[in-house]
Amino acid sequence: GTGMVATNAVKQRTGNVSAGTSSFSMIVLEKELSKPYEMIDMVTTPDGSLVAMVHCNNCTSDLNAWVNLFKEYQELLGIPVDMDEIYSKLYNIALTGDTDCGGLLSYNYISGEPVTGLADGRPLFVRSANDKFNLANFMRTHLYASVGVLKIGNDILFNEEKIKVDRITGHGGLFRTKGVGQRILAAAINSPISVMETAGEGGAWGIALLGSYLVNNEKKQSLADFLDESVFVGDAGIEVSPTPEDVAGFNAYIENYKAGLPIEEAAVKFK
């Protein structure tokens, strides 16, 4: 529950997404789901509310590997390397790409993904001769892939179970480059995403806040009230809403992604 605490997402109708080496979403529910789902785990907030959790084994590792390749190229040219600048340039150029990534596909499976039924994984980049292959689309497809499996799981919650949320907050390394990961995630789950200044801190920040709650809660407040009134004090972070174009593009991408999963299965079998 440290991610929930770090993002002030312990109340019903709130949620958080942690996106780093792996990723997960936690949506605090008002009521139980209509039925069990293999890809959705049921947990609780630290103070007992029901939470629907989608966990993905892979998120930014493959994306980071590609960024490191560009770092090596920059070093080859004898240009001083600033990793924050490289990430910023590559992530922001992705936002200029086609919303469906021009047909390009990426499977970021360093390991298997239970949500898509794969016990093992192979990182793959796939394109056809007629796809729009350029740097913007290349980076965009890898950003999409970082939250693609998360989208598949959350589509069940929002489209089939009709879950309603007032606020979803993102944290973790994907959000260090301002505005980009946030916009990609907003398109993926068709929901406004808030990111706080502490977005890159994740679970460690949540652990510290839980410790503070145990030690400094002189008013004997509930955890939610303590976070609202003593920690965040109205700070909901900076919110980015999805655009219809981004949502439609990501939906088209994820249909291609799901159709291409046999390619990933074949790679696992033969490589």
Model-found features: residue ranges?
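Active-site core segments that coordinate phosphate-bearing ligands/cofactors
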Residues: 1-169, 174-271
